[in-house]
Amino acid sequence: VAAAIACALFNLKCKIYMGYKDIKRQSPNVFRMKLMGAEVISVENGSGTLKDACNEALRDWSRNYQKSHYMIGTAAGPHPYPTIVKEFQKMIGEEAKKQILEQENRLPDAIIACVGGGSNAIGIFSDFIDEKVNLIGVEPAGKGIETGKHGAPLTHGRTGIYFGMKSHLMQSQEGQIEKSWSVSAGLDFPSVGPEHSWLNSINRAKYVSVTDIEALEAFQILSKK
């Protein structure tokens, strides 16, 4: 949606790739993007989710790089894209830090954020990495880790090369990328931004996973509070 807004503001053509499953799951956002003049292309390949949309967008850009610009909303992919996304998303951490200091006059004990590709999480983590604050990332365990239908590369994957980056990813013993799963379209991704992989390797951040059911139950509890 942000890309569609920016392109509408500057009168630029906007072509957005989305997996066909995500188009169904995020139909209100698709409507908003089309309303602003964006062309939304349904990706039928593979699992029809974020991973496949990213691949198709990169293929398009590689064919038309002289007259187009590639944009991605997650902190993953080849350099410098993870850094670009972090630099824009870090306002989340800056604002959170400012507000808690104003209200509590101290830093929080912990920062907890969901992790798919990891853009929102790295955004809020960024201003606390050098502070004595626990950083906790929560990956989607989907239907359960034991079922294989999850999206938890940091807690149940291993290091590899994917999407132009070295990071943790879900892969078979033969090194083939496995399908991810999450009730949330934004978390349905088989890898994670490389900075999260690094924070995990140096034990600066702790990463855990929760199932779809657990996440929805937590959402209901929070909504009632």
From Swiss-Prot:
EC number: 4.2.1.20
Catalytic activity: (1S,2R)-1-C-(indol-3-yl)glycerol 3-phosphate + L-serine = D-glyceraldehyde 3-phosphate + L-tryptophan + H2O
Cofactor(s) needed by this chain: pyridoxal 5'-phosphate
Alphabetical keyword list: Amino-acid biosynthesis, Aromatic amino acid biosynthesis, Lyase, Pyridoxal phosphate, Tryptophan biosynthesis
Gene3D superfamilies on file: 3.40.50.1100
UniProt keyword Amino-acid biosynthesis, yes or no: yes
UniProt GO MF annotations: tryptophan synthase activity
Complex and partners: Tetramer of two alpha and two beta chains.
Similarity annotation: Belongs to the TrpB family.
Protein name per the record: Tryptophan synthase beta chain
Gene name of the encoded protein: trpB
